[in-house]
């Protein structure tokens, strides 16, 4: 019984230790925020830009009386409520009155005029660790503009929710696009901070040597752990990634976007469903289940 209790205690302790991480935004708030007090600040953020207590970075900046002059927002928008691929117009944050510049509309990179009144650009967005998830493309284009305009670029790092595990082939650079910009694996195993360092070190942007890049690192991140091991609330990074399981499935099932098969977007179970009116579901299920994928069973569903 003592041994059994020891195992249970050890397991609980492991869970607690895995959950006891400090996000980049937590470290920034406690240790670095005074360094930008006299700067003109722009934020590249969305609804996931929360500290460990659930407070949004805009509230943190406002409470510390920092000079916030502009907000940039990626695909899915500032509030994360726009569907994939939908172009988004510039608008205004109703709380601060600050301009919100869309980087998924007419332009995918900040314009020269939008960078003119900025001293420092802070990136704080939860990525999901997949090459074709566009937040890292937005990160790259913003880094390039920061280098061009001599603007400090700070990344508040966050865990890769899919851990540091790597899966999939490297991108053929001849097919580089906004949904696959760099020669990295599909499931790349990196944080956004590590991606930013890789981009700068490999000179994947123009004027990379001029970029003044600062990464505010996560503290006590165990890169072997999936997101559910941490004592953090899952905030859906986009409308069709409602939970961690969907993020894991997205790694492979998002490839169906390049075909005439639906991946279930807009349903209650995106990427857990796929299909088409012309598919013979019985034959397909029989064929897929013969692979005996660990933890996966295919069954017939109907959806619109």
Question: What residue ranges belong to the model's regions?
Answer:
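Short internal beta-strands
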Residues: 69-76, 156
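A short helix->loop->beta-strand "cap" motif at the edges of active sites that frequently abuts
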Residues: 66, 148-152
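Hydrophobic h-region of N-terminal signal peptides that target proteins for export
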Residues: 10-19
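C-terminal and late-domain segments of enzyme folds
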Residues: 24-27, 32, 45, 181-295, ...
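N-terminal phosphate-binding or glycine-rich loops at protein starts, especially the Walker A/P-loop
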Residues: 21-66
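Glycine-rich, charge-decorated loop segments at or immediately adjacent to ligand/cofactor-binding or catalytic sites
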Residues: 80-85, 154-176
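Glycine/threonine-rich flexible loop motifs
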Residues: 127-139
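Glycine-rich oxoanion-binding loops at beta->alpha junctions
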Residues: 88-118, 130
């Amino acid at each position: 019984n003592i041994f059994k209790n020891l195992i249970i205690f050890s397991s609980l302790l492991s869970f607690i230790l895995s959950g006891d991480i400090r996000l980049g935004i937590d470290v920034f708030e406690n240790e670095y925020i005074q360094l930008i007090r006299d700067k003109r600040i722009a934020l590249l953020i969305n609804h996931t830009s929360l500290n460990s207590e659930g407070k949004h970075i805009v509230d943190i900046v406002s409470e510390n009386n920092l000079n916030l002059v502009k907000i940039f927002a990626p695909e899915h928008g500032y509030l994360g409520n726009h569907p994939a691929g939908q172009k988004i117009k510039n608008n205004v944050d109703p709380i601060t009155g600050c301009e919100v510049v869309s980087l998924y509309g007419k332009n995918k990179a900040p314009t020269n005029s939008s960078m003119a009144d900025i001293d420092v650009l802070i990136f704080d967005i939860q990525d999901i660790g997949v090459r074709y998830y566009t937040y890292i493309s937005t990160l790259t284009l913003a880094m390039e503009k920061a280098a061009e305009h001599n603007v400090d670029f700070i990344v508040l790092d966050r865990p890769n929710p899919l851990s540091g595990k790597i899966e999939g082939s490297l991108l053929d650079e001849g097919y580089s696009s906004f949904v696959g910009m760099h020669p990295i694996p599909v499931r790349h195993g990196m944080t956004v901070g590590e991606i930013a360092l890789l981009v700068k070190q490999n000179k994947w942007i123009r004027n990379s040597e001029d970029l003044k890049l600062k990464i505010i690192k996560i503290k006590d991140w165990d890169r072997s752990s999936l997101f559910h091991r941490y004592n953090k609330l899952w905030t859906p990074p986009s409308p069709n990634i409602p939970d961690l399981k969907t993020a894991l499935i997205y790694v492979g099932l998002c490839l169906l976007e390049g075909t005439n098969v639906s991946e279930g977007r807009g349903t209650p179970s995106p990427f857990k469903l796929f299909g088409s009116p012309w598919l013979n579901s019985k034959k397909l299920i029989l064929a897929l289940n013969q692979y005996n994928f660990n933890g996966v069973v295919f069954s017939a569903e109907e959806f619109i």
